[in-house]
């Protein structure tokens, strides 16, 4: 089984148990803490991926680092991953868990690029419009891209909405080139 499929299955199992046993908020907070530590520790990631470190040692490492930081149920889960020789999947399980939780809550991510910084009001209007258009809650990541000249581009999943001046100029250029003289 591929690691992506396994990660999704573990994440789904954790999500279902957390919902059923009513500790979803705790697990979500715990996984954010774990993700923060993992993203800041290359050595820990290497240890989790290393075939030279045995299951018991990986479990002890995880217990030592996270034992006092996360809840008992979350600790049981990450030790289970270690004992199943899947500790290397922990970062992707956390990512999949977040994606599944977003799906459940009707949240989608949008990458918004603009030529100039949007005011709070403009950003709020844009997010509300996207929310109405998609029927979902929008988590927008705003960034600047001066190449756009003006306007905005929005990427949601595989869909790109391009309202930039750069794009309009490209369309105009294409239509002028395509017209016979």
From Swiss-Prot:
PANTHER family: ATP SYNTHASE DELTA CHAIN. This is ATP synthase subunit delta. HAMAP family: ATP_synth_delta_bact. It is a peripheral membrane protein. It comes from Chlorobaculum parvum (strain DSM 263 / NCIMB 8327) (Chlorobium vibrioforme subsp. thiosulfatophilum). GO terms for cellular component: plasma membrane; proton-transporting ATP synthase complex. GO terms for molecular function: proton-transporting ATP synthase activity, rotational mechanism. Coiled coil: none annotated. F(1)F(0) ATP synthase produces ATP from ADP in the presence of a proton or sodium gradient. F-type ATPases consist of two structural domains, F(1) containing the extramembraneous catalytic core and F(0) containing the membrane proton channel, linked together by a central stalk and a peripheral stalk. During catalysis, ATP synthesis in the catalytic domain of F(1) is coupled via a rotary mechanism of the central stalk subunits to proton translocation. This protein is part of the stalk that links CF(0) to CF(1). It either transmits conformational changes from CF(0) to CF(1) or is implicated in proton conduction. The lineage of its organism: Bacteria, Pseudomonadati, Chlorobiota, Chlorobiia, Chlorobiales.
């Amino acid at each position: 089984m591929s690691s992506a499929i396994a990660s999704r299955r573990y994440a789904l199992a954790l999500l279902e148990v957390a919902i059923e046993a009513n500790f979803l908020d705790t697990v979500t907070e715990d996984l954010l803490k774990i993700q923060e530590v993992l993203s800041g520790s290359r050595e820990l990631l290497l240890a989790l991926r290393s075939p030279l470190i045995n299951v018991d040692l990986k479990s002890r490492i995880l217990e030592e680092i996270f034992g006092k930081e996360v809840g008992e149920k979350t600790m049981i889960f990450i030790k289970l991953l270690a004992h199943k020789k899947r500790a290397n999947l922990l970062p992707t399980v956390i990512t999949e868990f977040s994606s599944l939780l977003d799906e459940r809550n009707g949240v989608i991510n949008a990458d918004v690029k603009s030529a100039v910084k949007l005011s709070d009001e403009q950003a709020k209007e844009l997010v509300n419009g996207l929310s109405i258009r998609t029927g979902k809650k929008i988590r927008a990541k705003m960034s600047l891209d001066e190449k756009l000249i003006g306007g905005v581009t929005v990427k949601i999943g595989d869909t790109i909405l391009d309202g930039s001046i750069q794009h309009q100029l490209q369309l105009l250029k294409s239509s002028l080139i395509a017209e016979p003289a």
